[in-house]
Amino acid sequence: MKSTEQHYSIKEAMLFSQRIAQLSKALWKSIEKDWQQWIKPFNLNINEHHILWIAYHFKGASISEIAKFGVMHVSTAFNFSKKLEEKGLLSFSKKQDDKRNTYIELTEKGEEVLMKLMETYDPTRNAVFNGALPLRELYGKFPEILEMMCIVRNIYGDDFMEIFERAFENIKEDFVEQDGKLVKRAPKAEEHEKELASPG
């Protein structure tokens, strides 16, 4: 049986929740501005970019998965996915064994746009990155934000955090840095052919 006894004061609870709220709002304002500037040349808004991002990492996702992992309402996920379909960046489908859910997948054009976006990422134009840079210089690494991740896990659950982590693992595996840009890694067969073709 769960104990209902409080081990914190109301003042402590209010101070913590308001501190998180104010810091999150300040961070979001900066994040939103930088995100919009990054994707603006591609005629996308933040929800559309987020949907493309999730569809890429899922290799096909249901609208409800997009809503859950994009932290948006189902109708928002559907409406922005429809706009992406009209732009030729997504395709809609139903699965033979699941006629109730609508699934989306990146089209070739959608993946091209996402890859170009990755290539145009410029950390010098990102305020949060620049704000964290002195910490990296001091400690040799960026903040891991473990406490924040724990809070998010407790709110949204393990599934959410697994997808969150998978997305970043995919970036580590799928992309390499070339000439100061992130580019998609060549498939293994192509890499092997290049190794065979290179004189050595």
UniProtKB/Swiss-Prot annotation:
InterPro entries: HTH_MarR-typ, HTH_tscrpt_reg_Hpr, MarR/SlyA-like, Tscrpt_reg_MarR-type_CS, WH-like_DNA-bd_sf, WH_DNA-bd_sf. Residues 13-157 form the HTH marR-type domain. SUPFAM superfamilies: Winged helix' DNA-binding domain (SSF46785). It comes from the Bacteria. Residues 63-86 bind DNA. One of its GO terms (molecular function) is DNA-binding transcription factor activity. This is HTH-type transcriptional regulator Hpr. The lineage of its organism: Bacteria, Bacillati, Bacillota, Bacilli, Bacillales.
